[in-house]
Amino acid sequence: MPNLLREVNDGIAVLTLHRPGKLNALDYALVDALAASLDELEADPGVRAVILTGSGERAFSAGADIPEFAGSVEGGAERALREFVRRGQGLTRRIEAYSKPLIAAVNGIAFGAGCEITEAAPLALASDRARFAKPEIRLGFPPPFGGTQRLPRLVGRKRALQMILTAEPIDAHQAASIGLVNRVVEHTALLSEARLLAGQIARHSPAAVAACLRAVTRGLNVSIDEGLAVEAAQFASMVPTPDIRQGIHAFLSRRKE
């Protein structure tokens, strides 16, 4: 049985984490499959946006597969870093820097690595049944897939530390109020709302969308002056393209009507 489901309709891909018996916990095979699928979809010009969700009614992802991770820890620090941390950080970096709009459609619990994927995703919608938590401290280690870095940038240092140090979950509405997700939707409407959002973005120039994603993501981790240089470079990259000319021409034509 595949651990990752994929479907593409009308230029929108839906990837579904599919380990329902394990609450879609991320074992190494699933992390690798997700990374490979993201690469394939990014290279496909027919795909304009990607939605990532979880299988079943209970979970987006309960986090890392702890029994598998435990074996890596038993092998020592270097093995744990190689097999677990670097693999997971590589995935969340890939998601954060994705050149197409990637929407996390969080359909249930998003604990540990599931929360870290949500943090990395450029956009996120949450079912009203979703819950988010950083339970790693209960297992004796800090969040290892980027959670100590991205969460404070998203929600602020104090809110992030409260989640990280207490391991207490928050509900979907709390997640939206602090900026972890864009908004909350009814559980049964989650995928349709995610597709609607993807479609709203996909109608724009793919090159312009990619430039916006790069400008915002790269600018987050540099000074404002460096960020402005990134923004200018992304604008300049669009000037030679037909996209900008078509967009300006369409705007001017409407004004003349």
Enumerate the predicted regions with their spans.
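Glycine-centered loop/turn positions within well-structured domains
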Residues: 21, 58, 67, 149, ...
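Conserved CoA-thioester-binding segment of acyl-CoA-metabolizing enzymes
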Residues: 1-53, 79, 86, 90-93
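Terminal peptide-recognition signature
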Residues: 15, 19, 34, 52, ...
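Glycine- (often His-adjacent) and acidic-residue-rich active-site loop
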Residues: 54-91, 110, 140, 223
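Activation segment of ePK-like protein kinases, specifically the conserved APE
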Residues: 22, 180, 256-257
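C-terminal alpha-helix plus adjacent terminal tail
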Residues: 1-10, 57, 167-173, 192-257
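Crotonase-fold acyl-CoA enzyme core
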Residues: 93-207, 236-237, 241, 246
